[in-house]
Amino acid sequence: MIEQKIGVTEMNLTEKEFVKFLSKFDEHPFDVKIGDEVSHIGKGEPEFKVIFHEIPSMKELLTSTSIALGEAYMDGKLEIEGDLYHALNMFLGQMGKFSTDKKALKKLIFSSLTKKNQQKEVSSHYDIGNDFYKMWLDETMSYSCGYFKHPEDTLYQAQVQKVERINKKLYLKEGMTLCDIGCGWGYLLIEAAKKYGIRGVGITLSKEQKKEFEERIKENHLESQLEVRLMDYRDLPESGLKFDRVVSVGMLEHVGRDNYELFMKCVKSIMNPGGLFLLHYISALQEHPGDAWVKKYIFPGGVIPSLREIIHIAGDHQF
């Protein structure tokens, strides 16, 4: 439902088409302001207002609604009056209504899964400098979902609790070997080495992460227990490494849908008999190629795995 509330000047055809396009996102009521015109979308009192100083073209919206609206906000052409998080949540909750021209955005949405390209994608995100990440991550430098036991928990507490929970689930014992695939800045392995006496290897494609992790190993005097390697998970089978435990936290999102089975095979190849593998990732109920704006500006090549596809593939490989 579209309701024109205020009108000082008549909307032109392009503006009317634009408001009509936005009208499908009507699960929550909101206002759209273009110039002096305010239109109401949905039923009930508006929960927020979207103010457009300049509207995207219909071609931009149809090519990628996500990129068109995301870049409009980045460029100051779009403002949210009200709760920004709520507005984002409302639009993203209706992502199925977004338009995406997969042919025009083929290279962005379905990027190459070769080692060379994935190394480039990881580097573009993680090698922009450790100082940048230290500005907004907690002291553990954990870059994956936290475990909030209580609403008032700090980010630091949530990350510590997450790692404690993971290490307990791994049933670690002194002298065991542990591989962390996509080890980040190393907090999980450092805690496992200090509290359980394990020997571990972390692998990452980020030179900056490797550098920081190596410094942390020295600071904690864990040189005899831990090492970090610049390595692609696909090189694990030929590495000669074997482990009692394998863990991967928030890395599967970088693997790519066509490589999930290969990932499981690589993990299986380095596990000792009776070993245990813990896999943590952001999941979705259904398969989706990923959001175009997120792929362009945040996680190049990133894909959210569905729960059902990973359970199916894991079962096929006796996990």
Regions found by a protein language model. Give the residues of each.
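Conserved class I S-adenosyl-L-methionine
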Residues: 174-182
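Conserved SAM-binding strand-loop segment of SAM-dependent methyltransferases
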Residues: 220-235
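A short acidic, Gly/Pro-enriched loop at the edge of an enzyme's catalytic core
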Residues: 234-246
